[in-house]
């Protein structure tokens, strides 16, 4: 059986990744794709338990390296238990965050060594990278304003970080975009949701058609 495709959605907090993913799935399924959606951290019970620890607002003393290693542990279990089996079954796997989040948040955001993070990503994934990454770019202030307005969104520990941290995170994403422009495609997330979905679908379909 032909291996499936792995797509990751990345971007700063408030960029709307989850809303875009929710809108894309029925469209892609109507096109005949078997779609598996999942998220990081989380996706499987062990990884979801780690997610609770990472995002708990009460864990204010968490060290940056501790945070990174928890993400890496969650990533490994999620990959082995859910992502790889779906890819082997020929499915289209779309992940809400993956390896680029660690570079952005723990590398640029927390100031940890990016080379160390890239090595840990490689170790945890056995070198697996997404076939395509959609990076939803948004001004940091606008993203945080969206979070504040969204009463249905549970505020987590990372949401409580200051503006400068979130600005560094965005710079981390722009670093990854420049480093790997063939894999990462920038989407303007400041547009209306329907336009963001339209742009995302166009990029996805172009990639899917090139692989068919």
From Swiss-Prot:
PROSITE patterns: THYMIDYLATE_KINASE. The keyword Kinase applies. ATP binds at residues 11-18. It catalyses: dTMP + ATP = dTDP + ADP. It comes from the Bacteria. GO terms for cellular component: cytosol. Its EC number is 2.7.4.9. InterPro entries: P-loop_NTPase, Thymidylate_kin-like_dom, Thymidylate_kin_CS, Thymidylate_kinase. Keywords: ATP-binding, Kinase, Nucleotide biosynthesis, Nucleotide-binding, Transferase. It is an enzyme of class 2 (transferase). GO terms for biological process: dTDP biosynthetic process; dTTP biosynthetic process; dUDP biosynthetic process. The keyword Ion transport does not apply. One of its GO terms (molecular function) is ATP binding. CDD domains: TMPK. Gene3D superfamilies: P-loop containing nucleotide triphosphate hydrolases (3.40.50.300). NCBIfam families: DTMP_kinase. PANTHER family: THYMIDYLATE KINASE, UMP-CMP KINASE 2, MITOCHONDRIAL. Belongs to the thymidylate kinase family. Phosphorylation of dTMP to form dTDP in both de novo and salvage pathways of dTTP synthesis. This is Thymidylate kinase. It comes from Streptococcus gordonii (strain Challis / ATCC 35105 / BCRC 15272 / CH1 / DL1 / V288). The lineage of its organism: Bacteria, Bacillati, Bacillota, Bacilli, Lactobacillales.
């Amino acid at each position: 059986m032909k291996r499936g495709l792995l797509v990751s959605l990345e971007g700063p907090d408030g960029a709307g990744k989850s809303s875009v993913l929710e809108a894309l799935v029925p469209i892609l399924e109507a096109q005949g794709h078997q779609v598996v959606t999942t998220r990081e951290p989380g996706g499987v019970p062990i990884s979801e338990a780690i997610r609770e620890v990472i995002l708990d607002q009460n864990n204010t003393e968490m060290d940056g390296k501790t945070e990174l290693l928890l993400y890496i542990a969650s990533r490994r279990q999620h990959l082995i238990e859910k992502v790889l089996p779906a890819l082997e079954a020929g499915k289209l796997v779309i992940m809400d965050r993956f390896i680029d989040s660690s570079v952005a948040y723990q590398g640029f955001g927390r100031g940890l060594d990016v080379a160390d993070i890239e090595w840990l990503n490689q170790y945890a994934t056995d070198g697996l990278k997404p076939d395509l990454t959609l990076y939803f770019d948004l001004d940091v202030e606008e993203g945080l304003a969206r979070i504040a307005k969204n009463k249905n969104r549970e505020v987590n520990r990372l949401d409580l970080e200051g503006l400068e941290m979130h600005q560094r995170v965005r710079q981390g994403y722009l670093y990854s975009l420049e480093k790997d422009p063939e894999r990462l495609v920038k989407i303007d997330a400041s547009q209306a949701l329907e336009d963001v979905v339209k742009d995302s679908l166009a990029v996805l379909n172009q990639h899917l058609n090139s692989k068919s």
